[in-house]
Amino acid sequence: MNIGAADMGTGCDTILAQIAAEVLECSTDDISVFGADTDISPYDSGSYASSTTYVTGKAVENCALELRSRIEKFGAKLIGCDKSDVTFDGSCVRCEAGEHNGASVSLCDIATASMCGNDMALSVTNTHTSPISPPPFMVGAAEVEVDLVTGESRVVEYDACVDCGTPVNPNLARVQAEGGILQGIGMAMSENITYSDKGKLYENSFLQYKIPSRMDIGHINVEFESSFENAGPFGAKSIGEVVINTPLPAVTDALSHAAGKPVSYTHLRAHETAANL
């Protein structure tokens, strides 16, 4: 399977292989994924904007459906029956009706026979686009521990529930959600950029620009409220961006509760929190 999507940690190589394998009723071990080669990869608008699974995944689903149809048609031709009389189980095409009932031909034989003529290639190219991307939804709740003297704060627990349609791969969806939540917490509580009056960047290394590690945050719990998106591949929709949006307001609300008054989301650093407290 040759795809244009780039796996930047989104897990799309695995997820797109799963979609193809589901349609073709085979193991993901039987799907070889070739992606992100600008010499030979097909065009893809990019792995961003919450669109990889929803848009590219749908292209893969449609492509696999067409390939399956061609396999069934070619298998029926070899058996000598109508395409409407055959089924495909991932390994062979079998006739289920008529005078050839019970006859079958293996996928290996179909592949070999398809190379002996040029009337039907078992190779499919498909594109898919969508003017919209159905929004995912998420709710997040933060428990924040605050030092009332210094203003230092730490997220003790963060609970999230995500509606990303039907997760194609729940494990990958969960770790992507955890990573996005951690990034959102860092943007809210520790990451900052300031300049001198001469335009010099103060946070010019990771000693000053403090990205939180997994050790800096308490427990992150992610659950899924599965729905079914009719326009998505097997009911899936996006998850990549929504998970970074909730930590900032959740942490801000927690600190506001601790301070007993509203705290601006732009003032979550320790000295600012201490002043608010």
Regions from the PLM with identified roles:
Residues 12-19:
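Thiamine diphosphate
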Residues 3-5, 128, 272:
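Short, well-ordered turn and helix-capping elements at secondary-structure junctions
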Residues 267, 274-277:
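Single conserved hydrophobic/aromatic residue that forms the stacking wall/gate
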Residues 19-269:
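C-terminal catalytic domains of large/alpha subunits in multi-subunit enzymes
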Residues 5-6, 61:
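Conserved short loop/turn motifs at secondary-structure junctions
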